[in-house]
């Protein structure tokens, strides 16, 4: 039997993050969204440029990510920049929280993509790169 390739479709990438930060560790996690947000993502209407991730009460929360309202969504549309919960294992969250607290690292969204029909986010545990002037 042949091994099936996992289909991934890129939605958005945070190119500035790779320029401004040095990525130490990358992590894939899911994201909790509502239906109209997913439809808007399929159209590619998302901006990761000014987003960051916080650890609050043992949960990963992405803030500052802008998902434009879906055109046909009317009353079901949500606030475009509302905080969204990321889905990861508790052990991974504890590890990331410890790295942020002890080392002073930052969690930054690197990319957003569909994997097997589900929205996934690639997070980067980053350290701000020094200016080279």
Regions found by a protein language model. Give the residues of each.
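Helical mechanochemical/support elements of P-loop NTPase systems and associated helical scaffolds
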Residues: 19, 34-37, 89-92
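Extended, positively charged loop/linker patches that create polyanion-binding surfaces
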Residues: 41, 46-114
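A short beta-strand motif that forms the metal-chelation/ATP-contact edge
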Residues: 119-127
């Amino acid at each position: 039997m042949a091994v099936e390739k996992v289909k991934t479709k890129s939605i958005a990438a945070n190119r500035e993050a790779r320029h401004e930060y040095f990525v130490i560790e990358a992590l894939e996690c899911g994201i909790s969204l509502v239906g109209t947000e997913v439809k808007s993502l399929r159209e590619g209407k998302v901006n990761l440029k000014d987003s960051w991730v916080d650890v609050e009460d043992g949960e990963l929360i992405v803030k500052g990510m802008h998902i434009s309202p879906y055109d046909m969504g009317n009353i079901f549309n949500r606030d475009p920049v509302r905080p969204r919960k990321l889905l990861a294992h508790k052990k991974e969250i504890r590890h990331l929280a410890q790295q942020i607290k002890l080392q002073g690292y930052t969690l930054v969204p690197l990319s957003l993509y569909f994997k097997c029909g589900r929205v996934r986010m690639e997070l980067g545990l980053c350290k701000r790169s020094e200016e080279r002037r």
